[in-house]
């Protein structure tokens, strides 16, 4: 099914299993690597795409974090989702895909197909999935990851999503970021439990030049939090940091990383830092500088981030109030995002700027109408 060999000459297989109502990542071993014979590991994916409201509900992230992520995606930033194994990196990346406006083309590059491409395509997304050669079990007939990324650059103005950055594709990806070849959001996952560990892996292991690494704008860290008993593990977004551009050798020593959100273990919350609240984020101000009403106006930028956070929380509240979790699924979240963007444009045309209170009031009226419609259908 995978098109990749599994025999004594190739005793390792890394692939995906796609059934009508289930998806899973499969790792298989056989002799001689596994002397006792075949061994399999299955990692089942959620049938539907994760969304930011679903992560708010599960407490993986806060409404403010969701609003900030939404803002950064619309701002076409370069973003890495990092973390340890099974921390929810790919799930979070899939939820971020839902935040990309449907009028943008998306290109994904993966060696094992894990992102919810089919589900998003069914929702009307223009999305192209490229399957690349696995660094572990790939065959010569498959395309190398770096070649796939260079091909993506020739396909026009698109958002580029890389399932996992771990090999030769890193050089091609950061080269493209650095020269500005990608005008839309660029995102991917990578192993690392802190911004500096991501820097260390990218520069020292993957051999990306330090100057090229500066093309990274935002690093999100996902980790598993263990209960005092050690019996319960919870996924949490524990850190959101920006990569600043004015350092030369070591971003840790030269204050090249600035935290925007940090995890408070005592309260199990993701708290905003002074850098974010007081408008000292260079990346966010750079986004604002390209929007007339936001340029030099931190209050307007912050108001838009809070507006997005309020909308994400309202979706969760609607699901709780109606006892209908479908409100948090991708189908409805995409509709809610479309309505937010439409109302933002209409309000800006009418009053001259994107008034957060006015946008939310009209969006809330739309949400109430959607709830009534769903109740009648039920």
Feature map (PLM): residue ranges:
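Conserved lysine of the Walker
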Residues: 89
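Motif I (Walker A/P-loop) of helicase-class P-loop NTPases
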Residues: 65, 93-94
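Switch/coupling sub-region of P-loop NTPases
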Residues: 70-71, 76-86, 95-225
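Flexible glycine-/small-residue-rich
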Residues: 17-19, 30-32, 44, 110, ...
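Conserved P-loop NTPase
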Residues: 218-310
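Terminal-proximal interaction/regulatory segments of ATP-powered molecular machines
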Residues: 301-378
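Glycine-rich, charged/polar anion/phosphate-binding loops
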Residues: 11-15, 24-29, 147, 205, ...
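P-loop NTP-binding catalytic core
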Residues: 1-75
């Amino acid at each position: 099914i995978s098109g990749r060999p599994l025999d004594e000459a190739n005793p390792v297989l890394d692939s995906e299993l796609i059934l009508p109502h289930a998806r899973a990542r499969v790792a298989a071993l056989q002799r001689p690597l596994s002397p006792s014979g075949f061994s399999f590991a299955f990692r089942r994916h959620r049938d539907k795409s994760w969304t930011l409201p679903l992560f708010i509900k599960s407490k993986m992230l806060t409404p403010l974090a969701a609003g900030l992520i939404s803002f950064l995606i619309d701002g076409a930033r370069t973003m890495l989702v990092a973390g340890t194994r099974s921390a929810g990196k790919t799930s979070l990346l899939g939820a971020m895909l839902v935040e990309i406006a449907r009028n943008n083309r998306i290109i994904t590059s993966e060696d094992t197909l894990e992102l919810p491409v089919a589900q998003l395509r069914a929702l009307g997304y223009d999305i192209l999935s490229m399957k690349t050669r696995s660094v572990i079990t790939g065959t010569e007939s498959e395309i190398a990851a770096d070649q796939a990324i260079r091909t993506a650059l020739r396909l026009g103005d698109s958002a580029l999503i890389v399932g996992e950055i771990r090999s030769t594709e890193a050089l091609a990806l950061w080269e493209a970021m650095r020269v500005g070849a990608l005008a839309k959001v660029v995102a991917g996952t990578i192993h690392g439990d802190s911004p500096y560990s991501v820097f260390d892996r990218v520069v020292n292991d993957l051999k990306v030049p330090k100057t090229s690494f500066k093309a990274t704008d935002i690093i999100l860290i996902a980790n598993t939090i263990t209960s005092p008993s050690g019996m319960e593990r919870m996924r949490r977004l524990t850190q959101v940091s920006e990569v600043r551009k004015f350092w030369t050798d070591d971003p840790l020593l030269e204050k090249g990383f600035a935290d925007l959100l940090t995890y408070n273990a005592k309260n199990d919350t993701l708290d905003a830092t002074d850098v974010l609240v007081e408008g000292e984020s260079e990346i966010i101000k750079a986004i604002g500088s390209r929007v007339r009403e936001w340029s030099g106006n931190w209050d307007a930028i912050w108001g838009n981030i809070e507006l997005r956070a309020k909308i994400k929380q309202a979706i969760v509240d609607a699901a709780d109030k109606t006892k209908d979790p479908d409100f948090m699924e991708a189908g409805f979240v995409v509709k809610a995002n479309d309505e937010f963007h439409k109302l933002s444009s209409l309000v800006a045309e009418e009053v001259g700027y994107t008034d957060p209170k006015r946008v939310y009031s009209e969006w809330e009226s739309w949400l109430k109408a959607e709830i009534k419609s769903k109740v009648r259908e039920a």
